[in-house]
C-alpha cells in the first residue's frame, strides 16, 4: 500500500509539473506579445539614458544546480559589480535614472519571459541566486533547487523592499547571506510544501496586486 501511495504521489507531482510547464509557455508567450511594444520603447530609453547594453546578463542557478544566464533590462551603470556590493541597496548610486523607474514597476524583469520560454525559469518559483550565494546554502536550502527558478514568489512579494533593508547594513553582502537569505528561504521552503497550480495562480495575482498597490500608494503620497 505504501509503495502504491508513493507512486500515486509521484505521478501526481509529475502531472503538476507538466501543467506548470504548459502554463508557463502559454502565459509567457501571451505576455511577450502584449509587452513587445513597451519592451521596444524601454530598450530605446535605456540606450538614450546611459552608455552600455540594453540587457544585463548574469550567471544564476536554477533546477538541480544548473547554471544559466538570466536576462534583465539593464538598470545600473556598466561594470556595476566592480563598483560595489553584489546586492543592490537603497539609493544605490550605480542605478541609472531609467533604472530607478524600471525597478520601481518591476519592468526590468520582463526579459526573463525569454528565460521562461527557454525552460530555464518558471513563472512562480524561488528567485535564482548567483553561484556565490548558493554555495552558502544549508542542506535544507538546496531543496529549493528541485524546481526551476521563478520570476516571482511569495518571497519576492514579502521582500520587494529588500534594497531598503540592506541599505542600513554596514556590509550588505554579509547581511544578505547571514540575515536576509535565511529569512527568505523560510518562505521558499514553505512554498515547496504548498506546490500546486492553484497556489501558482494565487502568487501571480498577489504579485500583480503588490506592484499595482505600491504604485497607487506612491501616487497618493
Feature roles, as predicted:
Residues 103-112:
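Short acidic-aromatic low-complexity motifs
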Residues 8, 22, 26, 117:
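Active-site His/Glu-centered metal-binding helix of metallohydrolases
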Residues 98:
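Polar-ligand-bearing catalytic/cofactor-coordination segments
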Residues 56-94, 155-182, 186:
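Short, glycine-rich, amphipathic interfacial segments at transmembrane boundaries or analogous
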Residues 53, 114-221:
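Hydrophobic structural segments characteristic of membrane proteins
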Residues 13-78, 191-221:
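A hydrophobic, helix-centered structural microdomain
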